[in-house]
């Protein structure tokens, strides 16, 4: 058996949890502010939108490399080592972004940020499941959900105000010291709460994972702009797909896999993971399409659009701990069913958007939609990991975070592609029906605006169908029979069983 870390009852969970939440909040905040800053960064470095978008793309690609190996890292290194490394690296990356004199330097900063953030999220989830007993995990994950949801809610609005008042550099100058303070607090407050071993790193698996996930993520991020039949995009999908097939095959053969695919033998985990992936894709429809609608159709600035979407994010943050308490008492099934029912109705309501839809309609529908999402997201995630038990939790955390990352990338590319293709088709149809001449700029602009809205409506209809599919699957959720206690509640930690 490997080294067993501290498992005493004397360890206080509150200070550890508080430091973890602070780290999660600042990292989630960082993820949502970059898109608001892109126009000003383009001006500062005199670069194109395609070049500036690499600040988002490189962060996603780095996450795609780091997140799949987090299960190995959590088994190999202690809680303190990993958290201090991830927060320290994140703080350094943020400071580099703040002082960046050129685009290449800020790009390097984003890579370093992503390395820290990619480790941070799976690590925090694993620690929460370790220090809290099963009957309190729902509430604990709900509190974690406050950071996950509230930071993205205020991020765009806060960043928009900072950038308009000061500069995009200031945004990073504020985030960096907060991350540093959390790093310093972790030195004194974060204890080792999990078990460590000395597993052998599957180097070939890491290479295949990097090529596979990196190829697919980059393919989806560029397919919407270059076209899905572009030779580069097709090559990325082929190379990425073949690499992932080889990666899965190898992970089923090696003794210490990077991602443990045999956890899909657990029925509830598999079911909730499928629902999680579907809901993540559906959620990204609103995250990507609503800002486009508010800015391109109503002429809002990013800051104004952020204010419109702010209530929905706040509702998600407020509801997270409440939903966690309800999950601890009633389980995930009916929370998922109710949440998905609300999501279906409100997503369908967004298929009725027009060029003159009132602001109040958009705010209310989007906010209620986020309320529905808040009821189901954390319960299905927690229920799936509970089904695995603590011994396999790190594998489940790495797997779900990896699949959600892929689902987010696919969702963004998928819905933007639907909006674009359907929008162009609607514009042509409107021009033919109204007999609009391409030289009539006023009528052409009106047709483009109307066609774009119709394309957005079509994309939300697909999101509605996805929500219906998840709703049907939710009826098959059962309550996990596992009652495994957190190691800190035990006198000893059991050895991790090997899946066969």
Summary of predicted features, one role per range:
Residues 1-20, 385, 395, 442-500:
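Transmembrane-helix exit segments and adjacent C-terminal regions of multi-pass membrane proteins
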Residues 7-10, 183-210, 252-267, 328, ...:
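Flexible interhelical linker loops that connect adjacent transmembrane helices
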Residues 12, 16-36, 44, 57-68, ...:
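N-terminal transmembrane alpha-helices
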Residues 15-29, 34-38, 45-58, 71, ...:
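12-transmembrane solute porter fold
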Residues 420-441:
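Juxtamembrane non-transmembrane "cap" segments at the membrane-aqueous interface
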Residues 60, 67-204, 231:
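Helix-loop-helix hairpins in multi-pass membrane proteins, especially solute transporters
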